[in-house]
Curated annotation (Swiss-Prot):
CDD domains: Radical_SAM (cd01335). [4Fe-4S] cluster 1 binds at C11, C47, C80. Binds 2 [4Fe-4S] clusters. One cluster is coordinated with 3 cysteines and an exchangeable S-adenosyl-L-methionine. Keywords: 4Fe-4S, Cytoplasm, Iron, Iron-sulfur, Metal-binding, S-adenosyl-L-methionine, Transferase, tRNA processing. It comes from the Bacteria. One of its GO terms (molecular function) is 4 iron, 4 sulfur cluster binding. Belongs to the methylthiotransferase family. MiaB subfamily. Residues 143-374 form the Radical SAM core domain. This is tRNA-2-methylthio-N(6)-dimethylallyladenosine synthase. NCBIfam families: miaB-methiolase, MiaB/RimO family radical SAM methylthiotransferase. It is found in: Cytoplasm. InterPro entries: Elp3/MiaA/NifB-like_rSAM, Methylthiotransferase, Methylthiotransferase_CS, Methylthiotransferase_N, Methylthiotransferase_N_sf, MiaB_methiolase, rSAM, rSAM_horseshoe. [4Fe-4S] cluster 2 binds at C157, C161, C164.
Length: 441
């Protein structure tokens, strides 16, 4: 058997795509290996959201080239950097054999055979998103997923935020049919999956069809919830502009839908939000949060923030702080703005100096960490349901599960295997910055 090594960067969609690539390549006589030095094919499934992601790719390629010098090794660059940079990757790293975009991954077996046969570099960065889903049997999406699984319901983006490359690397919005998604969920349920996360670049923009009628995400969630063996449903990543009544109702009515929403806001300044082309205000975002809390009082939120967007003043940044103080997030992701080539933001004047961006990021992250710790500590003494896989902690008798709020929860037990792939009531006895400690009830 030949060795296959895949390294995935970035979002959940890349994790999902990496699993697909693994499953469609293994029938060619490959087995997955844990180190690139053991591989005959190395795939780097890249992200292009942040500047450092590209830097990480070329740094990793430099390391893998040293392996290639001593063995016959095929190097594949996949994902959004592949889509954005295309032939430039061959120019910067001429030892790379294949470049394939995220909507062309279904052609990888053919590309591997072609590259081996003609001994030349090959590239496919087309946008055949529909043929991508049509070309890959549902079984290939669902293999090797243990307790939780992703289902891609929507890909691409039509929002064109001025800081973001996704519309250029993933293409326009496309929604899969209800039947295709439901069939995939059925296969996952039959394989023992307990939790499904519906994913998309703008997942709540989902508008798939069922028997000639258009469905939204809220209706899709309630349909999937009818599958008996599926006990938890999540969705990510959503956009404030695409929140809708049906989704609010799903949070109110469907117990299987977890009380946790990742809803990126990016900034608390209306002026900056307008420059970002977000097409919502800070107050509209807060109204969405309030409405969701009315529907589901125990709901919690995470978000994304960008500090130092071009032209951001101290007053703009303080408005972001005020929004964070008002919402109170259970967790969040925050970054310094980095110009992405080809986006409008990269051409804006008044780029914020790096030292100011760093100082603001530290202030924001301090507040976000305080809120996360406070939320975790509020769980002490509570009994919550925890979904366990077979993931172990640092010690032989320790296993790790996941709460409804995506917190890691550690328990000690003499028989860890009894909890594998199960949901159990756990009493929380301690809380830390990024995790909880519990005991079996």
């Amino acid at each position: 058997m030949k060795g296959l090594y895949i390294k995935s960067y970035g979002c959940q969609m890349n994790v999902y795509d990496s699993l697909i690539m693994e499953n469609i390549i293994k029938p060619l006589g490959f087995t997955v290996v844990s180190e690139p030095s053991e591989a005959d094919v190395v795939i780097l499934n890249t992200c292009h959201i942040r500047e450092k992601a590209s830097e990480k790719l070329y740094s990793e390629l430099g390391k893998i080239r040293k392996i290639q010098e001593n063995k016959d090794l095929t190097i594949v660059v996949a994902g959004c950097v592949a889509q954005a940079e295309g032939e430039e990757i061959f120019e910067r790293s001429p030892f790379v054999d294949i470049v394939v975009g995220p909507q062309s991954i279904h052609t990888l077996p053919e590309l591997l055979v072609k590259a081996h046969r003609i001994k030349k570099q090959v590239i496919n960065i087309d946008f055949p998103v529909i043929s991508k889903f049509d070309a890959i049997p549902v079984e290939e999406y669902t293999k090797n997923q243990e307790t939780s699984a992703f289902i891609s319901v929507q890909e691409g983006c039509n929002k064109f935020c001025t800081f973001c490359v996704v519309p250029y690397t993933r293409g326009e919005e496309y929604s899969r049919t209800v039947e295709a998604i439901f069939n995939e969920a059925l296969v996952l349920a039959d394989s023992g999956i307990k939790e499904i996360t519906l994913i998309g670049q703008n997942v709540n923009a989902y508008h798939g069809t069922y028997k000639g009628c258009e469905w939204d995400l809220g209706k899709l969630i309630q349909h999937i919830a009818k599958i008996p063996n599926i006990e938890r449903i999540r969705y990510t990543t959503s956009h404030p502009r695409d929140m809708h009544q049906s989704l609010y109702e799903a949070h109110k009515l469907e117990e299987k839908l977890m009380p946790f929403v990742h809803l990126p806001v990016q900034s608390g300044s209306d002026r900056i939000l307008k420059k970002m082309n977000r097409k919502h205000t800070a107050e509209e975002y807060i109204d969405i949060i309030s409405h969701l809390r009315k529907q589901r009082p125990d709901i919690a939120f995470s978000s994304d923030f960008i500090v130092g967007f071009p032209g951001e003043t101290e007053e703009d940044f303080e408005n972001t702080i005020k929004l964070v103080e008002k919402v109170k997030f259970s967790q969040a992701y925050s970054f310094k703005y980095s110009p992405r080539p080809g986006t409008p933001g990269a051409e804006y004047p008044n780029q914020v100096p790096e030292e100011i961006k760093s100082e603001r990021l530290l202030r924001l992250q301090k507040l976000l960490r305080e809120q996360q710790l406070a939320f975790n500590r509020s769980m002490i003494g509570e009994t919550c349901t925890v979904l366990f896989s077979s993931k172990k902690g640092k010690f032989d008798n320790q296993i790790i599960g996941k709460t409804a709020y995506m917190q890691s929860c550690y328990i000690n037990t003499d028989n860890p295997s009894q909890f594998y792939n199960s949901i159990s009531p756990i009493k929380i006895i301690d809380a830390h910055q990024n995790s909880l400690t519990g005991v079996v009830c």
